[in-house]
């Protein structure tokens, strides 16, 4: 919300539905599958209310990134969403700028969900940070529709398809394939999950540890039972980042996890080649950083 606020007068309004956020929104009497179906029903009801002829697409991150701290979809959620979109002629657009290109253990995070979107946004892992590059992958039917029409695509940029950036991206993808790094991400992810649970799973101010592959989020709470967040004025996430840096660990902090104002979390996204020793250090140093930050609150 805070990123959008200053540009709001220039932007087209979009309708939002509830995110897949089981830690806070799944009812105690509800199974994960039932929760996912409820969200899909909400999406369908919203499309019907607006009129399917007025809805061009449903856009979501396959795994929520910076805004909410690696929200992992419940089983069947995206399959149900895909079915809703197909019934109403609505495109499914998935944003995998953060979670895609191997970060969660498959090249595309949506592979785990067994869903194919109509459009897929990718970036960070595409070039591994060596060159700035992003891409939009489109299903053939969309490309064919444009080709059979005017054939004119007026959304290019000056450095679109830059040869050096594309060469870097190709080199990164070749290394990922050559060195079997997707399998390594899956293996390391299981190890990191176990280490984080051992280090922070019973921490009185850690609400949830969630993620997949080498993409993890830790949500902080004032009270585990009520899930009450900390006062946003404390900026706990920023304190944790500062403490983590002093301990030699880089994390991605963010506030507003719950509703755009309340809530704190930190993201972990270590390199695909992180060793087991380094994974253990990450879990240990994050625990130390959280404890040090809380001591100053």
Predicted feature locations:
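Conserved N-terminal phosphate-binding loop of PLP-dependent enzymes in the Aspartate aminotransferase
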Residues: 1-297
